[in-house]
Structures are given as structure tokens and as C-alpha cells.
From Swiss-Prot:
Reaction(s) the record says it catalyses: a plastoquinone + NADH + (n+1) H(+)(in) = a plastoquinol + NAD(+) + n H(+)(out); a plastoquinone + NADPH + (n+1) H(+)(in) = a plastoquinol + NADP(+) + n H(+)(out)
A GO term, aspect molecular function: quinone binding
Subunit structure: NDH is composed of at least 16 different subunits, 5 of which are encoded in the nucleus.
Short name of any one Pfam family annotated for the protein: Oxidored_q4
Membrane protein topology class: Multi-pass membrane protein
HAMAP family in the cross-refs: NDH1_NuoA
Name of protein: NAD(P)H-quinone oxidoreductase subunit 3, organellar chromatophore
Localization per record: Plastid, Organellar chromatophore thylakoid membrane
Gene: ndhC
InterPro entries from the UniProt entry: NAD(P)H_OxRDtase_bac/plastid, NADH_UbQ/plastoQ_OxRdtase_su3, NDAH_ubi_oxred_su3_sf
């Protein structure tokens, strides 16, 4: 008897999950129009002629605020299931969550100290 016989369905799933995107990309490559003209290369801006350049430089502060937001947004995603199952998890899970929150508070204090949260 073959040892991996229980994984046949999983192997079939992997093959199909790999084949479908590859076939979709190949079909697009074969059926897509090949013409390149000047009008297709223009920037599209709500059906109007673009005003100004396409490349706008943003202040790096926007990226710092976005990065700090993403970090604490992910924290919320991790803490929500813990909060829902708080009564069933026990003291050890509570201590682990406190350690996790402490690490994030230290990260926030570090970002604040480095001036990542100041706009000046």
C-alpha cells in the first residue's frame, strides 16, 4: 500500500490550485490584443486629459503614520480573537496577551521618541 494515499485529494487540490491561475495567465497572454499605440500609453485620469505630472512626491511623514497605523491595526486583528475567547483561555493566555501589548507599547514609545509621530 502506498503511504501517501491519504493525501491524494490534497495533491489534486494543489495541482488544480496551481493549474487554474497558470491557465488564466496563459489565456490572457494569448488572447490579449498586441497593439501598442500612443493613446494606450497615456495616463487615464477620469476620462480627461491629465493635469501635471504623473509622479507626485509625498512627504515621508505620511509613510511613517501609515506604518504605525498598520502595526497597530494588525495588533487589533491579533487581539480580537483573544478578547472573544478570554474566559476559556485562562491565565497563561492573559499573560501572553499582556506581553504582546507590552512589546507594542515599547514599539510605540520608540517611534514617538524617534519623532515618527511628530509632523514638524
Amino acid at each position: 500500500m502506498f503511504v501517501l494515499s491519504g493525501y491524494d485529494a490534497f495533491l489534486g487540490f494543489l495541482l488544480i490550485a496551481t493549474a487554474v491561475p497558470v491557465l488564466a495567465l496563459l489565456t490572457n497572454k494569448i488572447l490579449a490584443p498586441k497593439s501598442r499605440n500612443g493613446e494606450r500609453e497615456l495616463t487615464y485620469e477620469s476620462g480627461m486629459e491629465p493635469v501635471g505630472g504623473a509622479w507626485i512626491q509625498f512627504n515621508i511623514r505620511y509613510y511613517m503614520f501609515a506604518l504605525v497605523f498598520v502595526i497597530f491595526d494588525v495588533e487589533t486583528v491579533f487581539l480580537y480573537p483573544w478578547a472573544v475567547a478570554f474566559h476559556r483561555l485562562g491565565l497563561l493566555a492573559f499573560i501572553e496577551a499582556l506581553i504582546f501589548i507590552a512589546i507594542l507599547v515599547i514599539a510605540l514609545a520608540y517611534a514617538w521618541r524617534k519623532g515618527a509621530l511628530e509632523w514638524s
